[in-house]
Swiss-Prot record:
Name of the featured protein: ATP-dependent Clp protease proteolytic subunit
InterPro entries xref list: ClpP, ClpP/crotonase-like_dom_sf, ClpP/TepA, ClpP_His_AS, ClpP_Ser_AS
Listed EC numbers: 3.4.21.92
Catalytic activity: Hydrolysis of proteins to small peptides in the presence of ATP and magnesium. alpha-casein is the usual test substrate. In the absence of ATP, only oligopeptides shorter than five residues are hydrolyzed (such as succinyl-Leu-Tyr-|-NHMec, and Leu-Tyr-Leu-|-Tyr-Trp, in which cleavage of the -Tyr-|-Leu- and -Tyr-|-Trp bonds also occurs)
GO biological process: protein quality control for misfolded or incompletely synthesized proteins
Length: 195
């Protein structure tokens, strides 16, 4: 299904200029993840982050997240880029940040991780499925367990929660309100009004 992308017109002293809404928001250093995270989404988000870093390495980037999660490797590509680039990446949850979306929300710069009040946040262990020979299934099972351990370690680092608690809580879907996510350490502040 294709969607109409709104066009905004900006008036300047030199005349009018029209932008699609995403390009206009990018001028304000705002990036959106507005759906499942796959390689295509990751490549777009990473390209925008690298562009904004080249434009001004000292100015924050604002990453808005409304995502049910997605592919671990795609999410980790975004995560690694967030940690690699010079500008702080402020994360803001709107709607929901689940699974890899919640992980990226927690990975924002300390003190700059936010959620709107009625958003929901959910963490859980990696999901996966494989079929084939027993050896192949074993290889993939060990890889999923390795990724689970890596994600739990990183959530421990970003939230300040003990690893044992993260392991317990991610055993099944663990839903939180914005206020609960703040208490958990996934975000720093619940925001109701833009400052």
């Amino acid at each position: 299904m294709s969607y109409l992308v709104p066009i905004v017109i900006e008036q300047t002293s030199r005349g009018e200029r029209s932008y699609d809404i995403w390009s206009r928001l990018l001028k304000d250093r705002t990036i959106f993840i507005g759906g499942p995270i796959d390689d295509h989404v990751a490549n777009l988000v990473i390209a925008q982050m690298l562009f904004l870093e080249a434009e001004d390495p000292e100015k924050d980037i604002h990453l808005y997240i409304n995502s049910p999660g997605g592919v671990i490797t795609a999410g980790m590509a975004i995560y690694d880029t967030m940690q690699y680039i010079k500008p702080d990446v402020s994360t803001i949850c709107i709607g929901q940040a689940a699974s890899m979306g919640a992980f990226l929300l927690a990975a924002g710069a300390k003190g700059k991780r936010f959620s709107l009040p009625y958003a929901r946040i959910m963490i859980h262990q990696p999901l996966g499925g494989v079929q084939g020979q027993a050896t192949d299934i074993d290889i993939h099972a060990r890889e999923i367990l390795r990724m689970r351990d890596m994600l739990n370690e990183l959530l421990t680092k970003h939230t300040g929660q003990p690893k044992e608690k993260i392991e317990r809580d991610t055993e099944r879907d663990f839903f939180m309100s914005a206020a609960e996510a703040k208490e958990y350490g996934i975000i720093d502040e619940v925001i109701t009004v833009r400052k």
